[in-house]
Amino acid sequence: MQDLIPYLIFTMIGYLSGSVMYSKLLPSLFKHVDITKISDDGNPGAGNVFKNIGPSFGMLCLFCDIFKGIIPVALCLYYLTWDNPLFSMVLAAPVLGHARKGKAIAVSFGVLLGLLPSSWMVLYLAVPFIFFSTLVRFNPHAWRVVIAFLCFILTVYVRVPIPALQLGALLVTITVVARHGIYIKSTHEKLRVDLGWNPGWLKRRE
């Protein structure tokens, strides 16, 4: 019981932190704009702030969405350890809080950044995201997210022999994939694969 309470406290802190939708709140407060009403998909995410309001305000919302994941995880590791399986809930809580209304990409990176410098697990998500956004592009974006997170969780289970981190990463992956799966199902958009580089030598040979 003594071990349970501290982890539950940080889990609640993380969930509440994740529940604050900065990409909806800040544009509403300072720009008097409801980002869910003016965006194409109605998602209260930083990407829609970039697209509909501008890069400077988009960066502000992005940082807030990332840091709301970093802070509870980093605070928990300052006082506790990830040796307890309950740490998996601390890791997943900000993502679960955000996913009630959003797609939870930025906050997922945030919780993984909160593990630094003890774990560089964030790279296992960043690398497939970059790869599938530049060299081989999976479109629409929701498909890219799903495939990147599936690569992430497979890599975690191969490379990270820590049960709490494996379970936490699995909970994060299930949450994000489920949210994007709902979007894919609602829009009926099919997967398209494009090369992100320009194979000029192929064109010259033609």
Whereabouts are the PLM-identified features?
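N-terminal signal-anchor transmembrane alpha helix
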Residues: 2-31
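Nucleotide and nucleotide-moiety/phosphate-recognizing core
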Residues: 6, 57-63, 67-96, 116-120, ...
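Transmembrane alpha-helix interface/packing and boundary motifs in multi-pass membrane proteins
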Residues: 13-24, 93-100, 134-139
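Cytosolic, membrane-interface loops and tails of multi-pass inner-membrane proteins
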Residues: 25-56, 184-206
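Interfacial segments of multi-pass membrane proteins
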Residues: 50-53, 76-79, 97, 105-137, ...
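Loop-to-transmembrane alpha-helix initiation sites
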Residues: 120-127, 141-149, 160-173
